[in-house]
Every structure is written in structure tokens, then in C-alpha cells.
């Protein structure tokens, strides 16, 4: 059947305008509830795949049932899909949402009394309740998908990643070779939610230009620029993977290729296959040809140590070694500096080009050589060395980050001091471990820092490395552990080690953290700067918290803030209510930006319209990251943030000529070089057309001879007092300031104000500047990010909609609250009301029509107040079933007008019926009295015969 248009988002669909008051203190308020809200979703990325619907992002080919929110819930009989437009490249570009009514596809039932089961669109017969037949595709109930939305989260229909984890197939590997190259590469990918994180290591290959994913026929599904982070390692993320590509991955039909300048179609390639050995892999090897004349032959090995003995288990995959033979014996040798240590025989076939084996009982010397990367693996056909591949065994290369958050809750004897620690590690190919540890908030001197295993018994700990102490007068420890051994490196990569910090007051440990690998996410700040430690001792006043955390923050070339927060030690009561705020110095009034409210211990995201004041604080090192919980709403953890940039100038960051920006693993320019400070936060970027070397944001606006970044607001030169302009994606929108009627009979017109004010409010403006005001003497309005004097009334400006004349906000000086209300338009009796001015909120009857408003302003009326719902007026105490286009009347929802506010709720149906048969009403089932055919009327018998 033809697709119906996508239903609108719940707020616009229902027309419910949530009004209320929220505190607006000087340290930064929550945004007030406005009749129209600014867009919360991130701006769509050019070329990004997927669809945005109802505040969520869906991958191409993904289907879902739309959720209209309470009290309507999930529309079970409506199926939406994210479809790729015909003109777009396969798997790329924004999709198109198409929704259709699937109720006509329900099968015809033979029973007389079908039932509507919860979570289903189609009715079923009572006797089928225990053995339901499969419904048509799309008719089974699905919870709304919500894998990334955490307000970027963990409820609803399982996302792609959750379904994959349930199947046990999240990690895949590929051996990459080429018929015209001696190069060999190995690709490892992990499917996490709807993103594919990949790392590619290679040998004997010139610098690759791109990593390419294709289907079996060679169609390009995704490409990523290849920027190696170190010798022979490329990292990347494929976000919003289409479902078709996920199916290809699960079916082992997705292929990976490395593209070079000499081989634009791909120099080496291979299919991704699932291997259970990937979960335990801690060592690896890439085997290349020793004969310089051969091509297209190579192999990879996945190795791990046994948990109970010094035995090396491995899986070896190879290609081209059999030389066209269906089956051949192979010989595997383990060498050290050319001397043979071990030798194995194996039989393989062309259908299974690989085998698994065990090297039992490694000696202590062999374990040392394994740690140092000096063991060589050689594979050749038995009976002749004409084809021979070899490579050295090293610790597994990865794009993940080894890190640890140290907190008092994880100490061997938990303590609650407010101290915190943060550690970052780098594992080298020879087994050495470089560490950087930050410790803040301890009440006494740090006396010991050790890397150790989990204690098997009380006071029985195995220490692998004694770390250097803190630098004099600081809170940083930097050094290298060179004696971990092969077993220690194996345990490190298996997330089995802990970092313990002992102090004079707590010699056994005041802080302790689990060393874990953080999956690669594309966040460049992990690799070019240390994380910011978050501690309760840094909160003002200090909080003796047993939790801790650290965070990475960075500004990209468009001055967008990227952040990633990790926490540890939060108790069960705080787990569900955690928020992260970015603000200025503690105790000073100013904007406070909510980064994210989240559940669990980690959060990440991007802020694209950070306030200039906060950008300036970031550049000066006076910005703070504040973590609040349910038990500590004023702050549980805090850390000081410093990001050197020119973003406080209100424009783009411009790199100085001759300065080479270091590259992060994802290929983006890092932000570590210190750049000179720019002009003040309100200064625009002068327009210099044609100047080479200066990157320009395609969303920048050019107005009055100056460039303004996307989201910038300013007063234009032609009317600096009574106009406000905003840049919205290369478009400048200027609105006149509309003054609300003053509440006093004799207002005063100030020279520096556009709107007249009452005399007593004018006197409040004569006080010292607003930044010095106490929180109760003014309000900070997050809509246009400005301070308002007590008693001020104004029409709000909400990006990207601009001036909202249908709402009036008031600053309540006594409480510091911003209270916004929708303008109540009178009910008109004329048939054709008109809007006198395009900017007016309310319509009015035409002049000379001889009709007046039937009702005055409901907010000021003496009689009962009515309710306006979905464009209609309902009298006080009236009940009705709302109508939702294009689905019609919602018979299971009842709305009622009370005190001028509509209240809607779903009808409460009784528990499942115990009677044998029932009667189906518009929403709920109820039992009916059974009557014999003698007592039933003739029309009832005729109707029953028709249904039978």
C-alpha cells in the first residue's frame, strides 16, 4: 500500500506546550520550559548516512514503530523505515523516513471473539494464546530503538550492537593480500551499537590512502581516510552502519581493502570472518614472503597464553601458500635469531586455509623472548621451502587506549576522602609499559604506586611494577615499567591488572583503579593530551566522595567541543542520575552548559554552539567540568579544564603558517600546539576573501562586511538596540525586538535600552554590573544566553526559530527564576480571522466585521478557563478522545480539561479475562454473559451466522 507521511514529532503532533518555572541562578540555570524549544539534536553531518526521527538517529534500512510518548505510547500498527534515496550512493547520504499503516495486512481470523494482546498490532484467537502463529513482517511489537540517545540511552528496542552481542559475534578479523603485491595486512573490526570500530595493521605496504569496505561484488559501501597513528596501524570508525552491511558482516561477506596511490582499486583485500580466538588474543604476528619474487602470499597469527600454564595457544590463517593444491602438509617453526626452538606439522586444505595449535610448556627464556618480540614464526610447505612466510610475534597492536580511574571506593579497604587519580598507559612492542599517573586531593603524601594483580587472598598481592613517585611539588608521575614479562603483558591486555596508590594516612591504598582498554571511538583528545582528573576534593565546598573520574575534552577546527567522561566508584543510588556541566570559575555568575545527563559510568558527545564566555574560560584555563549526582546535586566531582585555542574569538581556529598540527588516530588535526590568543569573544572574524591557507566553515555567514560563525548572535550595525541577528547555516535572520506592554502606567525609556521599563525596574539597572549581582537579583536566560534584570518581561529568542512572540518570559527577582508562558489568544466568533501583522501571535476579526472576541484572555477571564488542544477549544471539565493524524481517533486515550490545562491518560484496562470469551470494546475487553440460542434475538443469531 502507499506509504503514509511520517508522523510528526510528539510535541508538534499533540500541540502540548509545557509551561513552567525553573531556577536560573548565577552559576547557570537549566533552560526554562518554552512553548517552542531550540533544536536539541546535533546538526546533520554532510554525507552522513541514516535518518533522524523523533530525536533519534536510525541507520539505513532500519525499521521501527514510532513512539509518540506518554500517554500515547508506541504506534504498533505503524511501521517506519529509513530508506536510502535513489540518487544517493549505496550506504551513504541522508535517508528518507517512510511510514505506513500495517493493520490492513493483518490476517483474517476464523474465531468469533479475537483478542488484542499487548504488544501486537493484529488480533489473535483465544486458543492461540499459548502457540501464536508468526505475524506478518513488521506486525510484531518492537520497542522504540534508542541505542545512542541517553536523555546520545539504554532503554527501548535493542540496537544493532546489542543484538550482535546477544549473538556472540562482535569481533571479526580479515587477512588482506593482493595478487600483485608482497604486502600483507590484518584488519580487526568490532561492532558496538551501530558503529564499526576498525584497526588495520600492515607490512611491506606504502602509505595507504583509504580503508575501503565493499560487498562481494565490489560495490563500495564505506571509505575512510587512512592516517597511520604509528608504524603500520590505521584506526577508524564507521558510524550508523546500515542493516544490510551488518547482515553482510554476519554472513562473512563484507570485504576490507587498503587503497594506495599506485593501486586505486585496492592493493590488498580480504573478507571479514568471525573467530572466537579474537576475544582472548594478546599476541599477534603478520607473516610475509621471504622470496622477493613471489606475490599474493601471506598470513596472520592470533596468539594467547594459557591462564594456568606457560603454553602458547595460536590460530594461524594464511592465503596462497598451497599454490593451487587442494591439500598439502605444512611445517611451522619457532626461531630465535635463526636458531630452531620448536617445530610442528599440520595438514590443511584449500577449503580451510588455517589451523590452530599449542606450543606447550614454554621455558622462562622463551617467555622472556616472547615479551621482547624476538620469537619468529616461520611457515612453509613440508618437503620444499619454495614458498616460505615468516614474521615476529609481538604484543597485540590496537587502537584502544589503556587507562584507569582511581577512586577510594575501589580501594582494598574502601575510603571516602574526595581524592582521585587518573592513569594512561602505552604498551610498546618490546613489552615495556609507559605510564602517566595524576593524583589529586589526597590528604597526605603519596608513598607508593604499584601495578599489581587482583589479590587472591587478603593481604596477598602480586606486584608487577613499583612506579616512580610524584614529581616534586606536583601531582604527576611519569615513568616506564620494563619488567612486566610476557605473563604481565598478557594480563594487561586481558584487563586483569590494577593500579594502587598508597599514602601516609592509608598505606595499603587510598586510591585503586582497574586498568582497562577503552575501545577506540575517534576522539582525538585521548592521544594528544592527558585526561582531566575529576575529584570531590576539587568541588567548592569539598565533597568527601568515594567516587572519581577523568575526562577528555578538545575543540576541533570548527570550535565544536568534543568530550568524553569516565567515572568510577559511584554507588547504586547515584547510578541513574548523573549529569555533566561545563561552567566557569566556581562561585562566579555566568553560563553553565549541560553537556549530558546519562546513566552508568561513561558519556561522550559534541557541543556545537558553546557560549563565547565558556570558550574564553577554556582558553584561560578557568573552565570547570562539574559532575552532579542525586546525592550531591551541587556537585559530586569537579575538574579544571584548559584547552588552548583561538575559538574565543568567535570564529574558526586558524593554525599559524609553518605550524604542523599533529595527527590523531582518526586523521583529524590535534589541538596540542599552543596558539596565540585571539581578540575578545564578541569580535567577529574579518572577511578576507581569497586568502589561502585559512579554513572556512561552509556554514559561516557574511553580513555587513564581516564573517559570523554558525549559531552566532549579534546586534546589527543598522539597529544596535532594537534588532537581533543570528547566523543559521549561511543564512542571516534579523528580528526586531518586540517590546511587551509594561506593567506600570508611566514607563521610562532608557537611552541604552530598546524597550521602556517601569521606574522601579530602571533603578535596579543602575546597580553595579550584572556579573557582580547575586543570583537572586537577576536571571540568566539560556534561550539567548543573556542576563536579565529582576522584573524584566520579554519575548524569548529561541534558535533556530528566532523571536517567539507567542510566549512571554518574566525574570522573578525574588527567586531568580525565568518563568515563560504561552500567550493566550482570545476565542474569535468571526468566520475568517486574520493576522494584522505577519509577526503577530494572535489573529483577530477583520475591521468592520461587527464581531468581537467571544472570550477574553483565558488567563484573565473570571469564568471557568477552557483548554486549547490540537487547535481546538474545549470547555472546563469536558472529556474527549484525541485525534492524531493520519491515524485517526485514539480511542484508548482520554483527555480532560481541568483548570485550563488538558490532561491525557491511557485507559486502564482490567487484568486478563478469566472468562472463556469476551466482548471487545474500543479499547478493553470485558466478559459477556453467555446466553443460549433460545434466549438470543433473531438479529443476533443472523449476525453470528454471518461471522461463522
UniProtKB/Swiss-Prot annotation:
Keyword Magnesium in the entry? The reply is no
Which SUPFAM superfamilies does this UniProt record tie to the protein?
Answer: FnI-like domain (SSF57603)
Domain CHRD positions: 168-277, 279-398, 399-520, 526-646
A GO cellular component entry from the record: presynapse
Q: What is its main location?
A: secreted
Specify the domain of life of the species encoding this protein: Eukaryota
Q: Which residues are glycosylated?
A: 347, 430, 877
Q: Which residues form the signal peptide?
A: 1-26
Q: Which GO terms describe its biological process?
A: artery morphogenesis; BMP signaling pathway; cell population proliferation; central nervous system development; chordate pharynx development; cranial skeletal system development; descending aorta development; dorsal/ventral pattern formation
Q: Which Pfam families match?
A: CHRD, VWC
Q: Which UniProt keywords apply?
A: Developmental protein, Glycoprotein, Repeat, Secreted, Signal
Summarize what the UniProt record says about post-translational modification: Cleaved by tolloid proteases; cleavage participates in dorsoventral patterning during early development.
Localization of this protein: Secreted
Its function?
A: Dorsalizing factor. Key developmental protein that dorsalizes early vertebrate embryonic tissues by binding to ventralizing TGF-beta family bone morphogenetic proteins (BMPs) and sequestering them in latent complexes.
Subunit structure as annotated in this protein's UniProt entry: Interacts with TWSG1 and/or BMP4.
Query: What family does the entry list?
Result: Belongs to the chordin family.
Protein name per UniProt: Chordin
The taxonomy runs: Eukaryota, Metazoa, Chordata, Craniata, Vertebrata
